[in-house]
């Protein structure tokens, strides 16, 4: 899979074109509880998403738990989302990857995570990191906790399809 990477907010109009050209009308927007607003991502992205049906999912722990993933998958399915946009740090991007990985899962998601099983997931994933350093926007890995035990899911299909690196989004993050 070829990943497209753009730098700077000036490239954001491509986001709208990308969604339209991929026939994505309903989007699951995965964000941090506060970072989406504090980073200026919300005000920057809003004009580019106003012609789409957007469902925001931000009610999950900083270290994603399997229950959070299952809830996210249910929201994605119930709202009939066609694409995922992740705006946040490593945990947010991991959550979006996991929702992508298991949104078509017919089985027990916990068992599939433990066995590193990722089914067919052709849903487009767009990443806009608000932190520098996790590198999650460039990798095929995602971390989730099941019963306080850490599991890593790895599959090439989890690498975001499109990435926007916007330096202003990182200005509100802590130095640590």
What is each model feature region?
Residues 1-83:
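ATP/NTP phosphate-donor binding region
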Residues 4, 26-28, 55, 82-85, ...:
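Structural motif
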Residues 20, 24, 50, 74-78, ...:
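Generic secondary-structure signature for well-ordered alpha-helical cores
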Residues 39-42, 69, 96, 137-138, ...:
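Conserved strand-to-helix beginnings and helix N-cap segments that scaffold or border functional pockets
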Residues 44-45, 73, 92-106, 138-141:
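Short Gly/Thr/Asp-enriched flexible loops that form oxyanion-binding sites at enzyme active sites
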Residues 81-99, 130-136:
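Glycine/serine-rich anion-binding loops at beta->alpha junctions
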Residues 104-176:
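A glycine/threonine-rich phosphate-anchoring loop and its flanking beta-alpha core
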């Amino acid at each position: 899979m070829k990943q497209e990477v753009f730098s700077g907010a000036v490239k954001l109009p491509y986001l709208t074109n990308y969604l339209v050209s991929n026939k994505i009308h309903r989007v699951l927007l995965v964000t941090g509880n506060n970072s989406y607003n504090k980073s200026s991502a919300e005000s920057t992205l809003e004009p580019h998403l106003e012609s789409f049906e957007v469902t925001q999912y931000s009610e999950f722990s900083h270290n994603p738990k399997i229950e959070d993933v299952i809830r996210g998958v249910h929201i994605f399915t119930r709202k009939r989302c066609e694409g995922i946009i992740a705006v946040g740090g490593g945990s947010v991007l991991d959550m979006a990857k996991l929702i992508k990985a298991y949104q078509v899962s017919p089985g027990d998601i916990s068992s599939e995570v433990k066995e590193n099983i990722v089914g067919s997931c052709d849903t487009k994933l767009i990443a806009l990191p608000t932190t520098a350093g996790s590198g999650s926007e460039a990798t095929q890995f995602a971390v989730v906790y099941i019963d306080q035990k850490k599991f890593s899911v790895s599959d090439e299909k989890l690498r975001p399809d499109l990435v926007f690196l916007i330096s202003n989004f990182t200005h509100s993050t802590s130095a640590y």
